[in-house]
């Protein structure tokens, strides 16, 4: 085994965070034991290969089959070396490599079981093999030592007493060793593990740019492993001693890479020095052991520099000496570390050539002791020869003592013999001889020490370590873990009493023996206690601790000159002795309590009944004590101040009351004067024009009823409003369908009309907000326009409101834009998954409503049992099946019949009807039942609620059943048959319905039949018409569609306390039955499996965007009605900068740091409790129509910790800010885009923001980790020539840190500021892009004119991208209204049929039972009822309903009808047509004809369905759909030179007539309505890079960084710039490309971009780059250019 080479292994680690952030590439490849490295700077260079004993590939994850784990590394290296140790050899394993390469991880690892390194695994395996030994003649002992080499100094990591640096000495026999290094005996692996943890804690580590926990020292873990074998035959014990050295080296580093400065730089220099020496030693040993040099003579250069470094000196035996050595070279795989990695490989390759001459260390102690004794004899003879023989006796006395005992004895003897020192000093060589003698005696004593003595010494050191920690106030558990911290038991100390302990840096300070200095960190002399603050001097005071008689320590406080120091509230100027419990104040804010444990203990012994203070001694106590000593009475001062404030408040309140009263009187006088002036101006004119009043016409009762009926009908007429909604929203519906087809969502959208009827009640989410307000006053049910969403993939149908469609459409557009950049495979996978985040899909329930049925309860009045067979009607009026229900009155204890499989309910449901609103409902003829709880059991009580429309509120051709209207047309409406029969005095109710008694009846759900097989799992639930709590439900039944009917046989007993409202309810109101089933007939069955398939992870993830909030309501501005905007006059793109400035120490307001990462596009990093200002800067192109006048108000509110906000809630935290300044400013240097003068307009305003005024905890506290605070800001800015202020709204994202926190700049910010091209403050802003639209004010006119001017143009004719894929699909229009009328008629007839069937069934039952019934149930009454019910009026939506036949109209009535007809057939007036809509005469006739067809009830539905307005009118959709999106042959927006005769109105406004000149001068007319909308920045980047810009009349080209996010191009100063400096709207700009122009200007690769305000010439780096930019700016133009180039090349090739 002797002469073996060093085992060398290399191991490559994964990328760290630093390398991943720089997108590093792997340059290391491993194949077997061969390692190859590639030069990233010269890829064509041949890779360098190295061969080692082991090559470990740990770059990938553990799932990789080639991954080398910690276990594998130990199995290959550690187990072999441990085996050598058991054989008796010295063993060494050390790790080598650059910093952060993974050396410590390989050697020491982590705490996890599978992450442990070589050292823990080797120790565990060592004791495992020891414990597995069964030979009784073998005994083992293990000693460990742990040291670190820091800055060429050795420190003991196991003994806390060895705080100083240890000396490295060299013995002729032992070689280099560390003097006084602790060697602790261990008996188990747990002991070693505890020692390793204790040694790793004080080890020196620090953070660098390369590694967050960089080892700043070399660590050497030594194990002395002794094996004793007792030979029973010879009675001889032999020993084998092995030394196991496990070395964790610090990594080599470069100062520029690690960013080392100061102490880190000094540490790195020492690390590099020792590693350089190690490299020299390895190289020298490799050269000595190499073949060619063996036969040569030893040269001077063969000297091996072991002594140049402490590391190599201690490892001398392990490098080419008596040791079995293994080296692990740790490698970094990143290309940025190529040089360091190549150097490591070369050193490892040289280390392979080193050969070590290892020998078995057998019986070393006997030989060593003999040689040491000979050396002692020789040294003693040397002393005798020099005349120092009397020292021999002293030395003999020390033999056999422990090293510590011998040293103490020698010291005491030397102190007593003064002449001995003189003799030693003057004797030549005597001092060296004595030193060597001491050294030898220490070694002999250590060798003679028994194993038990070593264990006792180890335990004593452990006790000393725990005692030292206990004295410092650290409590330890028995297993060595930390238990807690307590006050020291002996040492005097200072306890911090500050409210904020961070102000005084530490909670507790120790006062050491001697002098303890207190001062600032920048003092010339080093201070023991360092404090900071304005009133702390460089050397503030001194604590002097002296020991007096009896061992008592006395602490004296000595203040320095000019330092403010107080003890118990008194200022100290001379040295003062401190007593335990004294309060010490240094400066103004540092408050401490002095504690002296020994002194306090003695005082308690002297006075055992010492009084405790009445209040705790804390910071407040010390401050009050200081004020009292200074003669300041805070209580009296506060009372005086409070009295002054009260007096001031009283005076100001009286003054304000007086001023308010005076102002009120002034306003009243002014109003009276104005009123008199108006009366005098108008009354004479009115009197002159006044005609003689006509006699009041007396209407008959029939005429009043007719007028009331007509008024009510036309008030709730909905035809025109429904048509407007259908026409105005058609373009949204078309776009949604087009996107659905292109994204293959299999979802279709179509308009649908929904009416709130009994058979189709509207869910709350479809009702508009004002529905709840007018529900009580509305006589007809509400009809709304909704969107029917047919999810063909999942077989589901949903209904959306129009507002929800618009919201979802925004998300669809984003998904469509993203899909253009995502691979098609990913898009298809996205289609197969239904998630909550997909805007096309909604969650759908398992059960679907089949239909509803109604059962009336009037048979309970007689009472007779009835079995009803009622139709199950769907919301569309289709009969889906039939339901058999039995209703009968029963006694309270009657049992339910046995139906076999029927279900018997466990108890009787108790219902309570309240009469408190009965008189009100009786007067209104509305059978609405009010409910309240009675005294019955709350567990079984069910409440019927009385809110909502009447039970028969569905639309009907016959208003007989509405029961909600007090005004009816004569002979047109009548009460229902049942109600007519049963109306009468309630006092005459039958005996079974006595008021106050309990009435019990039974409802039995028998069977359901004729339900289609497409519905499975049928169940039924029923409830009272107005109840909204839990319904009565049956169990689900399987439905096959064949065989006998479904038998529910569900019995429910209901007990009611008879009240007037209950009797009124059973007279006219039904019970509603709802039948549900699982719809199992899927439209596309093969797609079901795709829906459940998991989505593969997308290769691209787009950032989450913040929602756009609505403006925060203004607090100071009066509520103004927004005027109706007319045609758009002009549009501007606004670039807005938002800054939050914080007050700095120098008094300036500096913009707060902004982190531009994340979905918020900018997060403000703010400090807690600092004054702030908000600065807003507006940038836009200079134009004549946009002039900012002043900022009316700036409001902030909606404080929240989520991006979303509930805008419906009233925010109490809205705050109006104080505007400090506003006006036009000059652009900053960094905001300029071009070299010339920036012609853009910069308008800036600033406001003070006190976040504490919001009274919000989110703004007052420090933001928790991973949380962000959101706030909405709205600025109301007044503009010239505008009717109202423009509103700019922005959502802020903020994070609050503590006041003194140092904000770490993000990586992007560091890159930005480190480049030196931009100032730090210029990047600390958040940008927003807005679109300003200035529209003309639409003239109000008369109500009739307003109706004719309503924007009812059909938007379905506007072109939408992708509508070619709709295959002729068109949104429903006017025909939908007529079809919905037929559905309502059908529902009304079905309802009448059910009522009549119930009436006939009840009458037949009464006749068969011979019960006397009311007269009205006779056949004559029935016929009369039927005749009267057949003459009802139509529903409020019907245009065909007419009152009953009347007498012939007179002349006045005919004139009124003709006038109404003219108004209905009137077209747009000439003014509106000329000013806003370019429409021809023929088109006007077409529109007139269409309106006529729509209003003519004689036309067929097919004719009415062809309603379409002119397709040449401009689109009414603003924002996303401009004028170019609609097919307009002659767009008339913004003509170049308008003709006076075509625009008379406009000319009159521009040049007012002389008659109205005075009025114009008095009050200028404002014509425009501003509208500012924030533009959501697209996450899709079409292209980004540098472009050169050239503007006319500028100095030269400007290089700018451009990012294209359609439809905008954003320009930055550089790629490190985070703030947009210029925005170019590509949708309105014109891109021009000309090869002739390039040749003429001699500027290749250029193209021009022209806007309304400027023209820019852009130059790309290459021809290909230019075409890429053209494609990003204008894809159609780029395609045209490429097509021309292709044709040109083809022609050239043919030639």
UniProtKB/Swiss-Prot annotation:
Assembly mode: Dimeric motor; dimerization is required for ATP-driven processive motility. Monomer in vitro. Interacts with PPFIA1 and PPFIA4. Interacts with CALM1; the interaction is increased in presence of calcium and increases neuronal dense core vesicles motility. Interacts with PPFIA2 and TANC2; both interactions allow the recruitment of neuronal dense core vesicles to dendritic spines and decrease in presence of calcium. Interacts with SYT4 (unphosphorylated) and SYT11; both interactions increase in presence of calcium. Interacts with MADD.
Family listed: Belongs to the TRAFAC class myosin-kinesin ATPase superfamily. Kinesin family. Unc-104 subfamily.
Protein name: Kinesin-like protein KIF1A
Domain comment quoted from the record: Composed of an N-terminal active core containing the motor domain (MD) and a neck coil (NC), a central regulatory center required for dimerization and activation and containing the FHA domain and coiled coils (CC1 and CC2), and a cargo-recognition region containing a coiled coil (CC3), an undefined region (UDR) and the C-terminal PH domain.
GO cellular component terms attached to this protein's record: axon cytoplasm; microtubule; neuron projection; neuronal cell body; neuronal dense core vesicle; neuronal dense core vesicle membrane; perinuclear region of cytoplasm; synapse
Residues annotated for ATP binding in this entry: 102-105, 215
Enzyme Commission identifier(s): 5.6.1.3
Species the sequence originates in: Mus musculus (Mouse)
Residues that hold Mg(2+) according to the record: 104
PANTHER family assigned to the protein according to its UniProt record, in alphabetical order: KINESIN-LIKE PROTEIN KIF1A ISOFORM X1, STAR-RELATED LIPID TRANSFER PROTEIN 9
GO BP: anterograde synaptic vesicle transport; dense core granule cytoskeletal transport; regulation of dendritic spine development; regulation of dendritic spine morphogenesis
Keyword Coiled coil attributed: yes
Outcome reported for the amino acid change (mutating residue 239 to K): Results in reduced microtubule motor activity. Does not rescue defective axon cargo transport in neurons from KIF1A-deficient mice
Residues annotated for ADP binding in this entry: 67, 100-105
């Amino acid at each position: 085994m002797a002469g073996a080479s060093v085992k060398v292994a290399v191991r490559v680690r994964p990328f760290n965070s630093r390398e991943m952030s720089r997108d590093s590439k792997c340059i290391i490849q491993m194949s077997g034991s061969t390692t190859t490295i590639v030069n990233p700077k010269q890829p064509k260079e041949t890779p360098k290969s190295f061969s080692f004993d082991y090559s470990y590939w740990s770059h990938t994850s553990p799932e990789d089959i080639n991954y080398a784990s910690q276990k594998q590394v130990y199995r290959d290296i550690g187990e072999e070396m441990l085996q050598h140790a058991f054989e008796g050899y010295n063993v060494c394993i050390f790790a080598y490599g650059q910093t952060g390469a993974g050396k410590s991880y390989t050697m020491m690892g982590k705490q996890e079981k599978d992450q442990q390194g070589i050292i823990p695994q080797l120790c565990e395996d060592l004791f495992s093999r020891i414990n597995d030994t069964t030979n009784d003649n073998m005994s083992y002992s293990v000693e460990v030592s742990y040291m670190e080499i820091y800055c060429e100094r050795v420190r003991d990591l196991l003994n806390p007493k060895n705080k100083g640096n240890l000396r490295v000495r060299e013995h002729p026999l032992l070689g280099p060793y560390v003097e006084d290094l602790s060697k602790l005996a261990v008996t188990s692996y747990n002991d070693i593990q505890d020692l390793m943890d204790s040694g790793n804690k004080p080890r020196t580590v620090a953070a660098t740019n390369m590694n967050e926990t960089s080892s700043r020292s070399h660590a050497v873990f030594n194990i002395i492993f002794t094996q004793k074998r007792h030979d029973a035959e010879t009675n001889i014990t032999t020993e084998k001693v092995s030394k196991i050295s496990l070395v964790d080296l610090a990594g080599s580093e470069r100062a520029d890479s690690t960013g080392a400065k100061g102490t880190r730089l000094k540490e790195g220099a020492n690390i590099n020095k020792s590693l350089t020496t190690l490299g020299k030693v390895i190289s020298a040993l490799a050269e000595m052991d190499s073949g060619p040099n063996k036969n040569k003579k030893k040269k001077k250069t063969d000297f091996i520099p072991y002594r140049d470094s402490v590391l190599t000196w201690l490892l001398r035996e392990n490098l080419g000496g008596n040791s079995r050595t293994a080296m692990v070279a740790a490698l970094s795989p990143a290309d940025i570390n190529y040089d360091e990695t190549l150097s490591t490989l070369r050193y490892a390759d040289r280390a392979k050539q080193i050969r070590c001459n290892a020998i078995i260390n057998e019986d070393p102690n006997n030989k060593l002791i003999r040689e040491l004794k000979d050396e002692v004899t020789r040294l003693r003879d040397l002393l005798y020869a020099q005349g120092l023989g009397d020292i021999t006796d002293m030395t003999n006395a020390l033999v056999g003592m422990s090293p510590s005992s011998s040293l103490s004895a020698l010291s005491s003897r030397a102190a007593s013999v003064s002449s001995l020192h003189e003799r030693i000093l003057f004797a030549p060589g005597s001092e060296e001889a004595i030193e060597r003698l001491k050294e030898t005696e220490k070694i002999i004593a250590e060798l003679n020490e028994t194993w038990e003595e070593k264990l006792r010494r180890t335990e004593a050191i452990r006790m000393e370590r725990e005692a030292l920690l206990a004295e410092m106030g650290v409590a330890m558990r028995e297993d060595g873990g930390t238990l807690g911290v307590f006050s020291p038991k002996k040492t005097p100390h200072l306890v911090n009493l500050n409210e904020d302990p961070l102000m005084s840096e530490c909670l507790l300070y120790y006062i050491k023996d001697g002098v303890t200095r207190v001062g600032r960190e920048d003092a010339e002399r080093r201070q023991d206690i360092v404090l900071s603050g304005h009133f702390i001097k460089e050397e503030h005071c001194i604590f002097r601790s002296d020991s007096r008689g009896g061992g008592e320590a006395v602490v004296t406080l000595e203040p320095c000159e000019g330092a403010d120091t107080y003890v118990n509230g008194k200022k100290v100027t001379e040295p003062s002795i401190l007593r335990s419990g004294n309060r010490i104040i240094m400066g103004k804010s540092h408050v401490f309590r002095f504690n002296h444990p020994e002194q306090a203990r003695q005082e308690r012994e002297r006075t055992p009944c010492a009084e405790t203070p009445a209040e705790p001694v804390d910071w407040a106590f010390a401050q009050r004590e200081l004020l009292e000593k200074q003669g300041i009475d805070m209580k009296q001062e506060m009372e005086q101040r409070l009295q002054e404030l009260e007096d001031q408040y009283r005076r100001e309140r009286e003054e304000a009351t007086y001023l308010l009263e005076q102002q009120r009187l002034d306003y009243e006088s002014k109003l009276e004067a104005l009123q008199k002036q108006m009366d005098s101006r108008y009354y004479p004119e009115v009197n002159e024009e006044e005609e003689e009043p006509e006699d009041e016409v007396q209407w008959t009762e029939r005429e009043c009823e007719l007028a009331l009926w007509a008024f009510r009908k036309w008030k709730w007429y909905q035809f025109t409003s429904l048509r407007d909604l259908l026409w105005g929203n058609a373009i949204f519906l078309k776009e949604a369908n087009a996107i659905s087809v292109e994204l293959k969502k299999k979802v279709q959208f179509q308009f649908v009309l929904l009416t709130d009827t009994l058979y189709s009640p509207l869910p709350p989410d479809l009702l508009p907000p004002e529905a709840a307000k007018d529900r009580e006053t509305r006589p007809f049910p509400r009809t709304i326009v909704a969107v029917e969403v047919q999810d063909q993939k999942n077989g589901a149908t949903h209904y959306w409101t129009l507002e929800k469609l618009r919201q979802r459409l925004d998300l669809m557009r984003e998904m469509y834009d993203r899909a253009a950049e995502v691979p098609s495979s990913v898009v298809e996978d996205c289609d197969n998954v239904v998630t909550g985040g997909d805007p096309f899909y909604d969650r759908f329930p398992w059960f679907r409503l089949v239909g509803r049925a109604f059962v009336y309860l009037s048979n309970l009045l007689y009472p007779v049992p009835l079995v009803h067979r009622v139709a199950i009607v769907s919301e569309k009026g289709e009969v889906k099946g039939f339901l058999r229900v039995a209703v009968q009155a029963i006694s309270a204890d009657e049992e339910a019949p046995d139906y076999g499989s029927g279900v018997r309910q466990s108890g009787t449901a108790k219902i309570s009807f309240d009469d408190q609103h009965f008189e009100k409902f009786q007067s209104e003829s509305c059978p609405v039942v009010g409910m309240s709880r009675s005294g019955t059991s709350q567990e079984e009580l069910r409440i019927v609620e009385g809110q909502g429309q009447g039970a028969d509120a569905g639309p009907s051709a016959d208003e007989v059943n509405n029961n909600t209207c007090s005004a009816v047309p004569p002979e047109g409406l009548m009460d229902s048959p049942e109600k007519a029969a049963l109306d009468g005095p309630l006092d005459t109710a039958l005996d079974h319905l006595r008021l106050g008694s309990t009435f019990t009846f039974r409802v039995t759900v028998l069977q359901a039949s004729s339900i289609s097989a497409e519905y499975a799992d049928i169940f039924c639930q029923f409830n009272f018409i107005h109840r909204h709590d839990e319904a009565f439900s049956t169990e689900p039944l399987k439905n096959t569609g064949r065989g006998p009917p479904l038998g529910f046989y569900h019995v429910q007993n209901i007990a009611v306390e008879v009240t007037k409202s209950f009797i009124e309810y059973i007279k006219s109101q039904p019970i509603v039955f709802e039948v549900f089933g699982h719809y199992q007939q899927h439209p596309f069955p093969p797609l079901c499996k795709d829906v459940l398939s998991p989505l593969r992870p997308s290769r691209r993830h787009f950032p989450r965007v913040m929602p756009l909030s609505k403006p925060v309501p203004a607090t100071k501005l009066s509520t103004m009605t927004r005027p109706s905007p007319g045609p758009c006059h002009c549009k501007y793109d606004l670039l807005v900068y938002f800054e939050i400035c914080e007050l700095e120490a120098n008094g300036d307001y500096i913009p707060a740091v902004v982190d531009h990462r994340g979905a918020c596009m900018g997060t403000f990093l703010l400090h807690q409790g600092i004054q702030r200002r908000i600065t807003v800067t507006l940038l836009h192109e200079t134009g004549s129509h946009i002039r900012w006048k002043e900022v009316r108000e700036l409001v902030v509110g909606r404080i929240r910790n989520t991006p979303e906000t509930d805008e419906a809630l009233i925010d109490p935290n809205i705050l109006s800010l104080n505007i400090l300044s506003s006006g036009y400013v000059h652009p900053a240097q960094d905001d300029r885009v071009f070299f010339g003068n920036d012609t853009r307009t910069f308008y800036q305003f600033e406001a003070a923001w006190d976040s504490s005024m919001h009274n919000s905890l989110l703004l007052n506290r420090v933001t928790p980790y991973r949380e962000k605070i959101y706030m909405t800001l709205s600025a109301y800015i007044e503009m010239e020539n505008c009717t109202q202020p423009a509103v700019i709204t922005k959502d802020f994202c903020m994070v609050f840190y503590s006041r003194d926190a140092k904000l770490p700049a993000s990586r992007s910010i560091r890159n930005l500021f480190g480049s030196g091209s931009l100032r730090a403050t210029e990047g600390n802003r958040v940008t927003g892009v807005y679109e300003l639209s200035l529209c003309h004010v639409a003239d109000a006119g008369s109500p009739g004119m307003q109706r004719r001017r309503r924007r009812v143009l059909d938007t379905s004719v506007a072109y939408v991208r992708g509508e070619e894929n709709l295959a002729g699909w068109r949104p429903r229009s006017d025909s939908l209204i007529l079809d919905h009328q037929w559905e309502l008629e059908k529902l009304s007839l079905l309802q009448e049929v059910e009522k009549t069937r119930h009436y006939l069934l009840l009458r037949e039952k009464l006749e068969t039972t011979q019960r006397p019934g009311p007269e009205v149930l006779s056949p004559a009454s029935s016929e009369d009822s039927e005749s009267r019910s057949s003459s009802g009026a139509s529903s409020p939506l019907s245009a065909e309903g007419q009152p009953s036949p009347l007498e012939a109209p007179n002349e006045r009535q005919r004139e009124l009808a003709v006038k109404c007809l003219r108004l209905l057939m009137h077209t747009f007036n000439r003014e509106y047509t000329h000013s806003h809509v370019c429409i021809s005469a023929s088109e006007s006739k077409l529109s007139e004809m269409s309106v006529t067809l729509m209003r003519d009830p004689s036309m067929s539905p097919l004719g009415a369905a062809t309603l379409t307005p002119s397709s040449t009118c401009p689109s009414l959709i603003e924002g996303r759909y401009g004028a170019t999106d609609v097919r307009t042959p002659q767009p008339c927006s913004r003509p170049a030179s308008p003709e006076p005769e075509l625009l008379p109105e406009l000319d009159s406004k521009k040049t007012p007539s002389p008659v109205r000149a005075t009025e114009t001068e008095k009050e200028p007319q404002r014509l425009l309505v501003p509208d500012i909308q924030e533009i959501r920045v697209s996450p899709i980047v079409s292209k980004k890079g540098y472009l050169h810009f050239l503007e006319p009349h500028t100095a030269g080209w400007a290089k700018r960084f451009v990012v294209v996010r359609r439809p905008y191009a954003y320009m930055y100063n550089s790629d490190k710039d985070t703030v947009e400096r210029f925005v170019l709207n590509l949708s309105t700009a014109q891109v021009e490309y000309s090869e002739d122009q390039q040749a003429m200007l001699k500027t290749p690769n250029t193209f021009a971009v022209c806007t309304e305000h400027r023209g820019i010439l852009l130059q790309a780096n290459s021809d290909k780059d230019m075409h890429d930019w053209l494609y990003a700016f204008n894809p159609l133009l780029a395609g045209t250019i490429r097509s021309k180039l292709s044709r040109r090349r083809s022609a050239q090739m043919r030639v």
